[in-house]
Amino acid sequence: MDNTSVQGTYADNFAIRCTEPVLTTNPATNAKYYIYNNYINGYYNGITTKLTFQSTITDNEVHMRPDNTNVWPAHFHSGIFIEATNDNLVTKNLVDMPSSNPLQWWHYGIFTAGSTTPKIKCNSTNYVGVGIIANGLNNTT
């Protein structure tokens, strides 16, 4: 997927977006996605999953588009973003920016928030403000 002629803004420009359209009462019934072997170039945000169960994100290359707006509030971007998910696997992915830039402090390689037992291993990040961040995890095992 190539987005060299950017479409959208930092808030709505995603290469792949996987979500559960209806909030379920049992997280085990949330959708499962297998996102693998994708080449993503020029998007502000690469892959996002929300309200999923046992999704797998593996062997992807995400080359993010920099947003050098240095104003508050900052424009947060993620190569891979996982939110409110259960038992996901994120492995063997490459997330990067084209070059180093001090204005890219709000760009995250892999970001997970509000998730239960995420498994994040063997990934590579380069030229992003934060490589891997885990926030508000709910590990019940």
Regions found by a protein language model. Give the residues of each.
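All-beta strand scaffolds that present successive hydrophobic residues in beta-strands
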Residues: M1, Y10, N30-N37, S55-N60, ...
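Extracellular beta-strand/beta-solenoid scaffold signature
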Residues: Q7-N30, N41-K50, D59-T85, M97-A113, ...
